[in-house]
Amino acid sequence: MSQEKKVFKTEWAGRSLTIETGQLAKQANGAVLVRYGDTVVLSTATASKEPRDGDFFPLTVNYEEKMYAAGKIPGGFKKREGRPGDDATLTARLIDRPIRPLFPKGYKHDVQIMNMVLSADPDCSPQMAAMIGSSMALSVSDIPFQGPIAGVNVGYIDGKYIINPTVEEKEVSRLDLEVAGHKDAVNMVEAGASEITEQEMLEAIFFGHEEIQRLVDFQQQIVDHIQPVKQEFIPAERDEALVERVKSLTEEKGLKETVLTFDKQQRDENLDNLKEEIVNEFIDEEDPENELLIKEVYAILNELVKEEVRRLIADEKIRPDGRKPDEIRPLDSEVGILPRTHGSGLFTRGQTQALSVLTLGALGDYQLIDGLGPEEEKRFMHHYNFPNFSVGETGPVRAPGRREIGHGALGERALKYIIPDTADFPYTIRIVSEVLESNGSSSQASICGSTLALMDAGVPIKAPVAGIAMGLVTREDSYTILTDIQGMEDALGDMDFKVAGTKEGITAIQMDIKIDGLTREIIEEALEQARRGRLEIMNHMLQTIDQPRTELSAYAPKVVTMTIKPDKIRDVIGPGGKKINEIIDETGVKLDIEQDGTIFIGAVDQAMINRAREIIEEITREAEVGQTYQATVKRIEKYGAFVGLFPGKDALLHISQISKNRIEKVEDVLKIGDTIEVKITEIDKQGRVNASHRALEE
C-alpha cells in the first residue's frame, strides 16, 4: 500500500465525503480513513500469508463503535468497551454480505476487515461510511477483490425517495432501506417498511443503485490513481480425468435419484452413503492414507451434487423434494399450546418448525439501548434461538451468535410496524422464537410463529404478517426463481431473498446472493412471486386464528393508565423516591410515570392495581371550591384553626367561619384531633385554601 498520504473528495447526499490513504495503519494490507460530514471511520483490510484448509472462504468483518466517537464514557465497572452490541453485529453482517461474493472462487486466505468508528455524526451514517471504507480498504490493498462496491440508505417520505435520510427524516419515513452493489448490479438489500408495495420497493432499490454507481465510479478513480499491485491468485485446477471418472460413478450409482428425496435427513444419509461408496473405489489398499486424493474426490463429489441439484431445477423444473418452482411446502400451525405463557404460536412449514412465545411486561421493562446515538427505550423485542437439535446435531451451547442476532433482528423489523402504540397498548412485548426443526427459511417461520403468538396473546396488532424466502438458480442464458427454499436450495443456489409483510404490503426484506449481482428483472419477478407465496401462507395462518383475542391471558400483567398534573409527579415520587417505593412495597405493582403526568400501573392482581391507584389519587388529590370535606383539626391559632382535608392538603378555618354564633376563642369549640365538616370557599392565587363550617349552618 502507498505510504504517501493522499486525499480524495466528493459530495454524498449533500454532505462532504473524503477518503484518505497512506497515513494510518500502514502495516495492514489496505487502510483508508473515511470522513462523511463529522463521521470518521478507519477501515482496514488484512489477509493471511498462507491459505487455510477447508472448503469455505474465511472472511471476517468487524464493526466497532468506540464510545468516545459520540463523546460518551462507557458504562459498567470497567468503563471500557466490551463485546460488540447487537447493532454493531448487524452492521458487520451488513458489510460482509455485499463483499463476500466478490472474492475469487477458491481463495482461502484469512481476510479480516476492521471498521473503527472514531467520530459519529448521527445524520451521517457511520454504517454506510464503514461499508465504503471496507470496499476501499480492499480495493487499495494487494488482496484480490472484484470490487469496488458501495451502499446507501434510502428513505421514502411523502412519495419521494431520499438518499441517507437524517435521524429526523427517518422518524417519518415509511421505508428504512440499505442497498449495496457494484456498478452493474445490486447484490445486497436489507429493509424495514410500513406496508409499502412491491413496486415502491423496487423503485427504491434502483433509486439507491443510481447513487451507488456514482460512488463506485469515485472509488474506481482512487484505485486508478493509486494503482495497487494485487496478489497473483491462480485457482487450483481439477484433474479432468479424475472428474470424469467420479462423474461416471455418480451416474452409475444414481445421483439424480439420491438427490430427489423428500425427507432431508434421508437425503443426507443417502448422499453420504453414495459418496462413501465412490470414495472407496479410490482407496489404495497399499496406501490407505492417501488423504489428498480422497479429499479431492470428496470435493469433486460436492461439486457434482451441486451441479445436479441446479440442473434439475433449471432444466427439469424439479426440486430436491419434488416441488414445482413456485410451490410452498405443507403448512401447519397452532396457537395457545403453552398454558402459563401470555401467548404462543407454533408454525411448521415442511421440515422447518418454529415455536414463538410471547411475554407481556410493564413499560418499565423496556430494553435500554445506549450506543453512539441518543439513548433509546425499546419496548418490542424479538429474539431468535437455533439449538443444535433443530438440525439433528450435537455441539456446545453458546450465547447467541451473529446469525441468531441477525435473524432475530429481521423478525423484529418485520413485526415492529404492526405493534400498537403505547397509548393503545401500554405494554413491553418480548417474543422468543425457538427453532425446533430446520430445513431452510427458519427466520421466516419465526415471523409467522410470532404473528400467531401476538394474536394468541390478544395484542391488537394492525395486521398479521407472514414471511417467505425466495431462491434463485441461474444458467448462462436463463434463471429459475424458487418459492419457499429449503436448506439444500439455499446452500447450492444463488440467492436467499427473504420477504415479509401484510396483505397490503412489505414490512421487511433481506437479500443475500452468491453471484455478482441481480438485474431489475429478477428482483421484480422475485418480489411478485414472494407476494403470492406470502398471501398463501397468510390465508393458512388466518384459518388458525383470524384476529387477536379480545382478552389477555389470566397470567399476563394488567396495566391501568391514569393521568395526574405534571406538577404533582414529585409528590408521587417523594423525596429520594420514598413515596413511590412505599406504594410499590405495599401493593407489589410496577409504576411507570411519564413527564406529561401519565402513570401506568401494572400487576397481575387487579385489587393491587386498584389500591395503588387509590393511594396515588389521595396523594394528588386537590381541593375544589364548593366541595365539602370531613376535616381534622391539626393546629389552633388565635385567628382560627388549620384543618386537614386529606393527606397533603390543609385549609384555614377562620374563627369567623367556625359558627354563625360569635366565638371568643377557637379553643372554646375546637381542639386538636376533632373532626369537623367544612366547605371550601376560596383557593387564592398562591394555592392557599380557605374553608367554612358556618356556610353549612346557614
Swiss-Prot record:
- Single Gene Ontology MF annotation: polyribonucleotide nucleotidyltransferase activity
Q: Which top EC class applies here?
A: transferase
Kindly list the biological process annotations in GO that this record carries. mRNA catabolic process; RNA catabolic process; RNA processing
User: In the UniProt record, does the keyword Nucleotidyltransferase occur?
Assistant: yes
The record's subcellular location field reads: Cytoplasm
> Looking at the record's lineage, which domain of life comes first?
Bacteria
Q: Where is this protein primarily located?
A: cytoplasm
Q: Which parts of the sequence bind Mg(2+)?
A: 490, 496
Name all KH domain ranges: 557-616
| PROSITE patterns per the UniProt record, alphabetical | KH_TYPE_1 (PS50084), S1 (PS50126)
Q: Which UniProt keywords apply?
A: Cytoplasm, Magnesium, Metal-binding, Nucleotidyltransferase, RNA-binding, Transferase
Required co-factors: Mg(2+)
The record's note on quaternary structure and interaction partners says: Homodimer. Component of a possible RNA degradosome complex composed of cshA, eno, pfkA, pnp, rnjA, rnjB, rnpA and rny. Interacts specifically RNA helicase CshA and RNase J1.
**Can you tell me which family this protein belongs to?**
Belongs to the polyribonucleotide nucleotidyltransferase family.
What is the protein's known function? Involved in mRNA degradation. Catalyzes the phosphorolysis of single-stranded polyribonucleotides processively in the 3'- to 5'-direction.
The family database entries (NCBIfam families) matched by this protein are listed as: polynuc_phos (TIGR03591), PRK11824.1 (NF008805)
Name used for this protein in its record: Polyribonucleotide nucleotidyltransferase
Primary gene name: pnp
